[in-house]
Amino acid sequence: MTQKKVAILGAGSWGTGLALVLADNNHKPVIWGNLDKIVNEINESHTNSHYLPDIILPTEVKATLSLDEAIDGAEIVVIAIPTNAMRIVCKQLNEALKEPTILVHVSKGIEPETNLRMSEVIEEEIDAAKRKALVVLSGPSHAEEVALRHPTTLCASCKDLTAAEIVQDRFINNNLRIYTNDDVIGAEIGGALKNIIALGAGISDGLGYGDNAKAALMTRGMAEITRLGVAVGSNPQTFYGLTGIGDLIVTCTSVHSRNWRAGNMLGKGENLDEVLEKMGMVVEGVRTAKAVHGWAKKLDIDMPITESIYAILFENKDAREAVDLLMGRKKKIEKESF
């Protein structure tokens, strides 16, 4: 395979993990970061100890503080940043891009102020003439396991399947299997909203409830995700795939999940401010819950689990009381509630 340069915007766990994959595939990954300490550590020690402790990076993984240097000559630019920084980084990227480039984003969330998906934010901020294609790379994955080269599967979603296949070719190897899909909306809705349900799974575990409760929460949570997704144009089949149920399972059941860990602390009685301070990293489900709370009301979509998690996060609702209210809702036929 011909070596290609790929720029990765974001020196966090996911950006660094994807850089490792690209280096394993004999490509030339360059990470753009904004902290001297992390950039220098990647270049000098070949580690990123804050985000991926105990992982040794291939020497081919490079990092820079210069956006221009990172994207110069890159076939693909991967945007691997928290959703709250997406708009400002895309403004910078729009100024820096000199020619049409394949853009890939791996950020899972909804912008609360606008209810826009991340691809919509990117499209607003980066000129169409500079976007050769926009691909969503998503699925059931923890960066830590990708960096350990454990078997993982993702899906590259794009309206232009040729572009999705290019991304597939750059990242696929014996440790990371990539599928393609043309349902960008479904991939983004599944990836964003599962973080809310993962908070709920963590809360359930923190309260001491068992597997029955978590299985019910995940299943009914997926019903809510599908309901909203279909309302905004997703293919319902997408939610039975990697970016739907696959991503939900891994995020709700793993101690690697930031959203599960945050929910677990909430379930044990800590308040949101304490939890976020202890986490020290972005918990996307908190921001997404705020966005979807208003979005569901605007669309008149019934999302009782999401509403309950919002109330626990932002209205100091007692978690056990929230569960009691959910369990006491009027009876329904299951298939009519999807």
From Swiss-Prot:
User: What is the protein name given in its UniProt record?
Assistant: Glycerol-3-phosphate dehydrogenase [NAD(P)+]
User: Any idea which positions bind NADPH?
Assistant: 13-14, 108, 143, 258, 282, 284
Record function comment: Catalyzes the reduction of the glycolytic intermediate dihydroxyacetone phosphate (DHAP) to sn-glycerol 3-phosphate (G3P), the key precursor for phospholipid synthesis.
Q: What are the entry keywords?
A: Cytoplasm, Lipid biosynthesis, Lipid metabolism, NAD, NADP, Nucleotide-binding, Oxidoreductase, Phospholipid biosynthesis, Phospholipid metabolism
Sequence positions that bind sn-glycerol 3-phosphate: 108, 139, 141, 194, 247, 257-259
Q: Which reaction does it catalyse?
A: sn-glycerol 3-phosphate + NAD(+) = dihydroxyacetone phosphate + NADH + H(+); sn-glycerol 3-phosphate + NADP(+) = dihydroxyacetone phosphate + NADPH + H(+)
Question: Which pathway is it part of?
Answer: Membrane lipid metabolism; glycerophospholipid metabolism
Q: Where in the cell is it found?
A: Cytoplasm
Q: Which Gene3D superfamilies match?
A: N-(1-d-carboxylethyl)-l-norvaline Dehydrogenase, domain 2 (1.10.1040.10), NAD(P)-binding Rossmann-like Domain (3.40.50.720)
GO cellular component, alphabetical, reads: cytosol
From the broadest rank down, the organism's phylogenetic lineage runs: Bacteria, Bacillati, Bacillota, Bacilli, Bacillales
Q: Which Pfam families does the record associate with it? A: NAD_Gly3P_dh_C, NAD_Gly3P_dh_N
**Which example biological process does GO assign this protein?**
glycerol-3-phosphate catabolic process
Q: Which family does it belong to?
A: Belongs to the NAD-dependent glycerol-3-phosphate dehydrogenase family.
Q: Report the domain of life of the source organism.
A: Bacteria
Range of residues in the leader sequence:
none
Its Gene Ontology molecular function terms?
A: glycerol-3-phosphate dehydrogenase [NAD(P)+] activity; NAD binding
Locate the active site: 194
Please give the positions of the paired cysteines in each disulfide bond: none
Gene that this sequence comes from? gpsA
Family annotation (NCBIfam families) = PRK00094.1-2, PRK00094.1-3, PRK00094.1-4
